[in-house]
């Protein structure tokens, strides 16, 4: 088994009527949780990292871990650049072996978004690397980028078709009412807008900001055309809260091999639930 691109993975999901979850990881332990759970459930998953994660862990280190785990568990894996914005940064990581990229230029005007994305697509496709881009903006925070929810822009269905055709992307991230981070109250998703986008665009569609969404909402988005579900904050919250609880209850604990187990277990529960919500168990 080896590190693969997301293109075939998402095309299979689109044909099969399920979604592939993209789990944001940060270190060895969080990667172990995702890969072990996916392998046990025979589920396709995407291992995602923001620029901050790649800076923290190191691109070569992450690639080596993914490759080793794919072989160990006989499970195809994808490592994905999540919310990357700089061409040179993306190019360097692609040359190092990354096979899946999200170029996020959604903060730019429409024409500039197209231009920036097309530059990345033209480069990445030379290396058989799949490219995702976003049209519209989500509220909330990703790494150090903050978007006020009042300023978040929903995806225009007609523009989505023009955007997809002009850039040559392999998948499209849409803004339909989700946000990065956890929700203070239940979000109201614009399913009608999503249906219209699907009518205009035949590419696999991506939903960011899925942490905290109900099973009903996730499964409804999949029925309408979402093929990739991104989860980050919910994983961090489960991991960190379980770790805090353990250390509070066991102040004498000093061995990370012991005190990280409860954190991994809590995160594993979230990963298992998201895989079930996405309907991708047994699809790898």
From Swiss-Prot:
Belongs to the class II fructose-bisphosphate aldolase family. TagBP aldolase GatY subfamily. It catalyses: D-tagatofuranose 1,6-bisphosphate = D-glyceraldehyde 3-phosphate + dihydroxyacetone phosphate. It comes from the Bacteria. It is an enzyme of class 4 (lyase). Binds 1 zinc ion per subunit. Dihydroxyacetone phosphate binds at residues 181, 209-211, 230-233. Zn(2+) binds at residues 83, 180, 208. Keywords: Galactitol metabolism, Lyase, Metal-binding, Zinc. GO terms for cellular component: cytosol. Catalytic subunit of the tagatose-1,6-bisphosphate aldolase GatYZ, which catalyzes the reversible aldol condensation of dihydroxyacetone phosphate (DHAP or glycerone-phosphate) with glyceraldehyde 3-phosphate (G3P) to produce tagatose 1,6-bisphosphate (TBP). Requires GatZ subunit for full activity and stability. Is involved in the catabolism of galactitol. This is D-tagatose-1,6-bisphosphate aldolase subunit GatY. The active site is at residue 82. GO terms for molecular function: tagatose-bisphosphate aldolase activity; zinc ion binding. Pathway: Carbohydrate metabolism; D-tagatose 6-phosphate degradation; D-glyceraldehyde 3-phosphate and glycerone phosphate from D-tagatose 6-phosphate: step 2/2. Forms a complex with GatZ. Gene3D superfamilies: Aldolase class I (3.20.20.70). Coiled coil: none annotated. The lineage of its organism: Bacteria, Pseudomonadati, Pseudomonadota, Gammaproteobacteria, Enterobacterales. InterPro entries: Aldolase_TIM (IPR013785), Class_II_FBP_aldolase (IPR050246), FBA_II (IPR000771), TagBP_ald_KbaY/GatY (IPR011288), TagBP_aldolase_GatY (IPR023955). Its cofactor is Zn(2+). Its EC number is 4.1.2.40. One of its GO terms (biological process) is galactitol catabolic process. It comes from Escherichia coli O139:H28 (strain E24377A / ETEC).
């Amino acid at each position: 088994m080896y590190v693969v691109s997301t293109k075939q993975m998402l095309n299979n999901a689109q044909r099969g009527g399920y979604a592939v979850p993209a789990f944001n990881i940060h270190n060895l332990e969080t990667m172990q949780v995702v890969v072990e759970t996916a392998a046990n459930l025979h589920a396709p998953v995407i291992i995602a990292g923001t620029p901050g994660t790649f800076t923290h862990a190191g691109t070569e280190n992450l690639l080596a871990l993914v490759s080793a785990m794919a072989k160990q568990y006989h499970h195809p894996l994808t490592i994905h650049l999540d919310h990357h914005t700089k061409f040179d940064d993306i190019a360097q990581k692609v040359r190092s072996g990354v096979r899946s990229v999200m170029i996020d230029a959604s903060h730019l005007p429409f024409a500039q978004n197209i231009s920036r994305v097309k530059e990345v697509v033209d480069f990445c496709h030379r290396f058989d690397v799949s490219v995702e881009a976003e049209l519209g903006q989500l509220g909330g925070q990703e790494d150090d980028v903050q978007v006020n929810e009042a300023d978040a822009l929903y995806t225009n269905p007609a523009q989505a078709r023009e955007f997809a055709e002009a850039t040559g992307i392999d998948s499209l991230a849409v803004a339909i009412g989700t946000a990065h981070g956890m929700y203070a109250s239940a979000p109201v998703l614009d399913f009608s807008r999503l249906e219209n986008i699907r009518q205009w665009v035949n590419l696999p569609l991506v939903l960011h900001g899925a942490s905290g969404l109900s099973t009903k909402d996730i499964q409804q988005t999949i029925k309408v055309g979402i093929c990739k579900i991104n989860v980050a904050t919910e994983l961090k919250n489960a991991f960190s809260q379980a770790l805090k609880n353990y250390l509070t209850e066991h102040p004498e604990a000093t061995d990370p091999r012991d005190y990280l187990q409860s954190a991994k277990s809590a995160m594993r529960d979230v990963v298992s639930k998201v895989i079930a919500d996405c309907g991708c168990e047994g699809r790898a």
